[in-house]
């Protein structure tokens, strides 16, 4: 049994003497503890000591000077960055590498966007194709304008766009500025997208529709694709946008149904997204409807196939597949880097199921320009009221031509791999 020695203190202890009293009592307890069990006191003293720094630990357990002299140190290094440099499996696959953005067209687009205070999903979402899309010839260069600011009210686990519950209100001059910028570039096809604005009563539907109208007023020849949110499931707002003069209505499923709750914001559901695409088609049957899926989250083939069936059941015309790329360490990890041959498989499968067009590849994104030339031809023919049978035949011929070009690109990617 431990004995306790009582330290007699004055009855009246004032101010700073209280701390002295507590210290004396502590020393008394320590002394009695030492007399009873010296090993316990040693343990307490070890805990009280300052813990060694990480650097000190690494110096003690890491390579010694002799290890560096003999060359053994290189086998003892555990630095993750060093391991990644030396391990090919820890690095990005060769087919996911892109060139540094450059060129006159690239800098011209960037300058105009800054001058007119416009945001693009190309920059905000760190798209790997920015150099290709912005750096093309004037008639080919494309920028996906992100409307209603650069801050989203949702926080999906794959997206690097800034989030805030109460972002700044939309710029009332944005529709006019956007139309002005696009008319300057002399584009034939433009993509408009938007952050989710759950803070707005209409989800921003009227702002988007106004922007499309302004663009058509300034440059009626330009084809407009609008990649919208789900308007919190308000299908009337989806119909407002679909009834504007746009040509392609796009809304992304992002992933398969089973993974949606783990990847997208809780306010975005798989069935809700399907309803938005269906409502747009019903409001304007002549619209081309489009969606996009990212692969690499751990989805199965059966899940992807079921998603394609769900899209065909609502008459979705276009689907794209791309590789999920982790924007930062705070976002969801990549489960798998899908090979180019697997992307080719899903493209063929989608076309077999009756999709009008499918762009599928590691670097393909929902607004990637690869399919725009084909979609342009489809829209123009629909505008001129070409017969359905003749239209389908032309579409098939154009699609086969485009597929042959993509096959050449895939073959090159495989060769690089």
Curated annotation (Swiss-Prot):
Q: Which SMART domains match?
A: Elp3
EC main class here is transferase
Catalytic reactions on record: [[Fe-S] cluster scaffold protein carrying a second [4Fe-4S](2+) cluster] + N(6)-octanoyl-L-lysyl-[protein] + 2 oxidized [2Fe-2S]-[ferredoxin] + 2 S-adenosyl-L-methionine + 4 H(+) = [[Fe-S] cluster scaffold protein] + N(6)-[(R)-dihydrolipoyl]-L-lysyl-[protein] + 4 Fe(3+) + 2 hydrogen sulfide + 2 5'-deoxyadenosine + 2 L-methionine + 2 reduced [2Fe-2S]-[ferredoxin]
Give start-end positions of Basic and acidic residues composition bias: 391-417
Transmembrane regions listed in the UniProt entry = none
- Radical SAM core domain ranges (all copies): 137-356
Pfam families recorded: LIAS_N, Radical_SAM
Q: Where is this region: Disordered?
A: 35-56, 389-417
Q: Which GO terms describe its molecular function?
A: 4 iron, 4 sulfur cluster binding; lipoate synthase activity; metal ion binding
Q: Which family does it belong to?
A: Belongs to the radical SAM superfamily. Lipoyl synthase family.
Supply the name of the protein: Lipoyl synthase, mitochondrial
Species assigned in the record: Komagataella phaffii (strain GS115 / ATCC 20864)
Give the taxonomic lineage as stored in the record. Eukaryota, Fungi, Dikarya, Ascomycota, Saccharomycotina
């Amino acid at each position: 049994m431990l004995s306790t020695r009582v330290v007699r203190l004055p009855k009246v202890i004032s101010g700073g003497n209280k701390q002295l009293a507590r210290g004396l009592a502590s020393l008394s307890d320590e002394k009695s503890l030492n007399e009873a069990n010296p090993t316990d006191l040693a343990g307490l003293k070890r805990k009280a000591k300052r813990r060694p720094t990480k650097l000190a630990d690494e110096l003690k357990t890491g390579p010694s000077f002799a290890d560096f002299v003999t060359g053994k140190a290189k086998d003892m290094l555990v630095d993750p960055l060093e391991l990644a440099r030396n391990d090919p499996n820890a690095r990005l696959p060769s087919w996911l590498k892109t060139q540094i953005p450059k060129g006159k067209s690239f800098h011209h687009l960037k300058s105009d966007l800054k001058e007119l205070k416009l945001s693009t999903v190309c920059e905000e979402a760190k798209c790997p194709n920015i150099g290709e899309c912005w750096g093309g010839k004037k008639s080919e260069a494309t920028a996906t304008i992100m409307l209603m600011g650069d801050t989203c009210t949702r926080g999906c686990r794959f997206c690097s766009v800034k989030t805030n519950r109460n972002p700044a209100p939309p710029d009332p001059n944005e529709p006019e500025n956007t139309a002005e910028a696009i008319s300057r570039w002399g584009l034939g096809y433009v993509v408009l997208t938007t952050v989710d604005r759950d803070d707005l009563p209409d989800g921003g539907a009227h702002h988007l529709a106004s922007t499309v109208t302004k663009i058509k007023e300034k440059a009626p020849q330009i084809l407009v694709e609008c990649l919208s949110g789900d308007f919190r499931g308000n299908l009337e707002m989806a119909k407002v946008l679909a009834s504007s003069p746009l040509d392609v209505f796009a809304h992304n499923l992002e992933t398969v149904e089973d993974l949606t709750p783990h990847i997208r914001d809780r306010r975005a559901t798989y069935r809700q997204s399907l309803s938005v695409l269906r409502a747009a088609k019903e409001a304007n049957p002549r619209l081309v409807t489009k969606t996009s899926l990212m692969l690499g989250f751990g989805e199965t083939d059966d899940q992807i196939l079921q998603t394609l069936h769900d899209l065909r059941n609502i008459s979705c015309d276009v689907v794209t597949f791309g590789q999920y790329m982790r924007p930062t360490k705070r976002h969801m990890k990549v489960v798998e880097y899908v090979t180019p041959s697997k992307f080719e498989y899903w493209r063929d499968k989608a076309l077999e199921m009756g999709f009008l067009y499918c762009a599928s590849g590691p670097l393909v994104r929902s607004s990637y320009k690869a399919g725009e030339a084909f979609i342009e031809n489809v829209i123009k023919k629909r505008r001129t009221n070409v017969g359905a049978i003749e239209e389908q035949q032309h579409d098939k011929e154009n699609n086969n031509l485009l597929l042959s070009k993509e096959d050449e690109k895939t073959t090159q990617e495989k060769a690089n791999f």
